[in-house]
Amino acid sequence: SELCAVCHEDIAKAFAKSPHHLVDIGKKQGFEGRACEACHGPAEKHAESADAAEVRNPGKLTAAAADKICLSCHLNQPTHVGRLQSSHAKDQISCTACHKVHANGPDGLIARTPAALNAQCASCHINVWTQFQKPNHHKVPEGAMTCVDCHNPHGSIRPAMMQSFGSNEPGCLNCHGDKRGPFTFEHGPVRFEGCASCHEPHGSANPRMLARQEVRLVCLECHANLPTVNATGTIGVVPPAFHDLRSPRFQNCTVCHQKIHGSYVDRDLLK
C-alpha cells in the first residue's frame, strides 16, 4: 500500500480515514495483510508499467463481479448473509452504489446522518419517498427514523428486505412491541400475513396508517360475506355477525373490536 500511495496520494489520504485502512495497519476484524491488492488484485505489473490495464478496477466490473470482491470478506457478517439473494443484487445494484470504499469516516463506508442516509435511498426509491409526503407517515423525512431502521439494504429472508429481530420477527415489532403477543386469541392476519396486510408502512391518508382511508374498508376485505348486494342494490346487508353496515354505529369496527391485533381475554377481540 505504501508503494501505491506514491502515485495515488489523494486516494491514500482518503483511505486513511476509512475502516478498510484497519485491514492495512492492524489485525482488527481478522483481515490483516489485505490492503490495496485485496480489492485490486496483483498490482506488480501495474506498479512497473503504470498501465491501468494491468490492475483490476472494481468500478468497471459488473455488479456481480464487484460484489464478489466485497463478499470475499463480508459475506459471513450477520447483516450480509442475504446479499446474494437480495433484490439489490438481482437488480445489479453493486455494493459500491451505496458504499464509498476509500473514503468516509471511521464508523462506516456510507453517510451516517439520518438525512444523508435517507436521501441516498430516496435517490433510487423515488416512488417510496413520495409516500412519505402523505399526511400520516413514519418520521423518516423529519430525520427521526432512517430507512435501515426497517430495511436491511444487504438483504433479508423477509419480503422487501425487512429487518428481522429475535426469531425472525418483522422489524415493526421492534418499536411496536405491544402488538407482538403471543395472544390467547390471535387475529390470524397479524400472525400469518404481517403488519402490511392492513397497514401502509411508508405513508397513508389514515391516522393509523391503514391501507384504506376508513378502518371498516380494511376489515371488510376479509370479513365480508359475498355476495352482499340485496335486490335494491344495497351493499353490506350480510356482513359478519349480521351487522347492518348501513347503520352508522356499525361503520367503525374498532369501536367494539378494540384489540384487533389480538386479545388475552376475548375471542371476538372486544377487549
What do these predicted regions represent?
Residues 1-271:
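Short sequence/structural segments immediately N-terminal
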